[in-house]
A protein has these predicted regions:
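Active-site catalytic motif of lipid deacylating hydrolases and related acyltransferases
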Residues: 22-33, 44-119, 167, 177, ...
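Serine-dependent carboxylesterase/thioesterase catalytic core
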Residues: 56, 60, 99-199
Length: 337
């Protein structure tokens, strides 16, 4: 059966209250406003063949897209370890309204769950850690499709270095405008407030938050890290891991935590291969701090260069990403008010 047909049938069953998620009425959830063809085109998956492991959805950060960020690191390494892997690319390199970008995550999770018949392990970096939480908060069908969520350097409570929180950024925003997503990164934004109101970790999902002292973009890290969820509450389904608590001499910044850091990868791998969130000792403990290559056996896949070259005409045809310049934070969608 063709995957699209399989997805359509599974979605129909799900909407009718049948299938693996009994009781979830998709029709009662916030309606996805994005063109379904765009949502479909944004998702790329390997065949769903490894039934003993959860399929993994990789979610990129701001200024990049799924293939650029993951096709040379996490994706081949996870495939090598027997995982089915998907990447999703939300619009305009993450510059637009994150409420819109979250619809791409909702659709991806529903589709992967329906086509694979398994719950999904999601790994996201930066905005790709923050924004999918919006999908999990407001769409029960998205929550029901996920068993693990690994968040790498996610500004979960906003960041002190948001462009709108400094005089120059505020001036530029009020005159020329700033990308919509930039306003939503601020600690006092309506987006952050709505996201963290009530349960920060909804659903039967294990959450692993990994962050670093040397993150120049997601601040503060101490005394209470903005990347952490339910910090200090001892929730058994949540692990908040500061890399320097594991490896005191490890220097990892905002970019490398989501691209090349070995300890981060091993902790993420531990989370998605065991029940519960990541466990530092089980993942290797002090051994994660030894002189190791940035990622285990990392090497550019032979076809990586050709894949990137194949993207060029598509990028040229699509033109420059929309900047989504606005002079104020986008209003909250009605379902979040």
């Amino acid at each position: 059966m063709k995957p699209r047909l399989l997805f359509a049938l599974a979605a129909a069953l799900l909407a009718g209250g049948c299938g693996s998620d009994v009781g979830i009425d998709v029709a009662s959830e916030p309606k996805l406003e994005t063109d379904p063809a765009l949502l479909d085109a944004a998702l790329e998956c390997t065949p769903f063949a490894n039934t003993d492991k959860p399929p993994v959805l990789l979610v990129h950060g701001t200024f990049t897209h799924g293939q650029e960020q993951f096709n040379w690191n996490y994706k081949p390494l996870l495939i090598e370890r027997g995982f089915d892997v998907c990447t999703v690319t939300y619009p305009d390199r993450g510059l637009g309204d994150q409420q819109v970008s979250a619809e791409y995550i909702v659709h991806a999770l529903r589709r992967i769950h329906a086509e694979s018949g398994r719950k999904v392990a999601m790994i996201g970096h930066s905005q790709g850690a923050l924004m999918p939480r919006w999908a999990l908060k407001w769409w029960p069908s998205a929550r029901a499709a996920v068993e693990d969520f690994v968040l790498l350097a996610g500004p979960n409570h906003g960041t002190l270095v948001a462009a709108t929180d400094n005089p120059l950024g505020a001036m530029v925003g009020s005159t020329l405008g700033l990308p919509a997503a930039f306003y939503q990164f601020a600690r006092g934004s309506s987006f952050i407030g709505a996201l963290n109101a009530g349960d920060e970790t909804p659903g039967d999902v294990d959450y692993t938050n990994i962050y670093t002292l040397f993150d120049e973009l997601v601040q503060p890290v101490v005394p209470e890290p903005t990347a952490a969820l339910e910090f200090g509450e001892d929730n058994p389904k949540v692990a908040n891991i500061l890399l320097q608590d594991v490896c005191p001499l490890l220097i990892v910044d905002h970019l490398t935590i989501g691209l090349t850091d070995r300890a981060t990868f091993e902790l993420a791998l531990d989370a998605i291969t065991h029940v519960g969130p990541a466990n530092v000792e089980r993942a290797g403990g002090a051994a994660l701090c030894h002189a190791l290559p940035p990622l285990p056996g990392i090497a550019l896949p032979p076809n990586f260069l050709f894949e990137m070259l194949a993207l060029l005409p598509i990028e040229i045809e699509n033109g420059a990403p929309g900047l989504h310049l606005v002079r104020a934070e986008p209003p909250l969608k009605p379902y979040a008010q």
